[in-house]
Swiss-Prot record:
Catalytic reaction list: (6R)-5,10-methylene-5,6,7,8-tetrahydrofolate + NADP(+) = (6R)-5,10-methenyltetrahydrofolate + NADPH; (6R)-5,10-methenyltetrahydrofolate + H2O = (6R)-10-formyltetrahydrofolate + H(+)
Subunit and partners: Homodimer.
The family this protein is said to belong to: Belongs to the tetrahydrofolate dehydrogenase/cyclohydrolase family.
Organism from which the protein derives: Saccharophagus degradans (strain 2-40 / ATCC 43961 / DSM 17024)
The protein, known as: Bifunctional protein FolD
Enzyme Commission number(s) of this protein: 1.5.1.5, 3.5.4.9
The encoding gene: folD
Entry keywords, A to Z: Amino-acid biosynthesis, Histidine biosynthesis, Hydrolase, Methionine biosynthesis, Multifunctional enzyme, NADP, One-carbon metabolism, Oxidoreductase, Purine biosynthesis
Length: 280
């Protein structure tokens, strides 16, 4: 069999077309344009590139991106003050604090200062807790993007055994919670897991979120599994050895073009949703 390609790039483009119409309607009905505020602290080139990509995504659908740049010397107190200022600004519908921030800043305190209704990147503890409990909150952009991709391709999760490899607070942990909420049976594996291969061999769905190139070997994955690779490394490879799975897996997310496009797309999607709730 040939694996179904879960094309995140195509889905992101389709969603952008739909979001453009939503934004046009909001502008016409309310006279306001949805705004995503992005905060970049310091001059890390990779972070600057990510912020630019998010700004470009906003432009493509007619949204505005409010870019807030702060120096590397910024203190926790100064960053908290800026976040509170954006929280209080009714024209701002979403707030993104670009990770990582300089080491002197308490990143967790700053994430948690973002108002729940503007936490469109799903980074607050409150938002994570509400999401895990099945209450209304915006999900972390990457795992939420994965869930949207699986849903778009009608991948069955109910009763399936999903193995998530990785436990980061912005990917592995929320991914496991979202899969659990979708009635999957979930196993979380990490750097201290013993017999990792044995766990993965049992999986109907494998999510690679470990941050190491091709760490998960193709022979560990059973025939007919759904394979989701959330990694990206130089050379265009992910966390999973994908090539040998092209004719064994039921479905795979390509690298690049699978999970990656869905991350920024979900951030924009959730910002438009926040604006719709505010502007009607």
């Amino acid at each position: 069999m040939s694996a179904l390609i879960l094309d995140g790039k195509a889905l992101a483009k389709k969603t952008e077309d739909e979001l453009t119409q939503c934004v046009d309607k909001l502008k016409a009905s309310s006279g306001h344009t949805p705004i995503l505020a992005t905060i970049l602290v310091g001059d890390d080139p990779a972070s600057a590139t990510y912020v630019k990509m998010k700004g470009n995504a906003c432009s493509r659908i007619g949204m505005e991106s409010l870019k807030v740049e702060m120096p590397t010397s910024t203190t926790t107190e100064q960053l908290l003050a800026k976040i509170n200022e954006l929280n209080a600004n009714p024209a701002v519908h979403g707030i993104l604090l670009q990770h990582p921030v300089p080491e002197q800043i308490d990143e967790r305190a700053c994430f948690d200062a973002i108002a729940l209704e503007k936490d469109v990147d799903g980074v607050t503890c409150l938002g994570f807790g509400r999401m895990a409990m099945g209450e209304e909150a915006y999900g972390c952009a990457t795992p939420k993007g994965i869930m949207r991709l699986l849903e778009a391709y009608n991948i069955e999760l109910n009763g399936k055994h999903a193995v998530v490899v990785g436990r980061s607070p912005i990917l592995g942990k929320p991914m496991a919670a979202m899969l659990l909420n979708a009635n999957a049976t979930v196993t979380i594996c990490h750097s201290r897991t013993q017999n990792l291969e044995a766990h993965i061999k049992q999986a109907d769905i494998v999510v690679g979120a470990v941050g190491k190139p091709e760490f998960i070997k193709a022979e560990w994955i059973k025939d007919g599994a759904v394979v989701v690779d959330a990694g990206y490394h130089p050379g265009g490879v992910g966390d999973i050895e994908l090539a040998p799975l092209a004719d064994r897996a039921a479905a795979i997310t390509p690298v690049p073009g699978g999970v990656g496009p869905m991350t920024i797309n979900t951030l924009i999607y959730q910002t438009v949703d926040s604006a719709q709730k505010k502007l009607g």
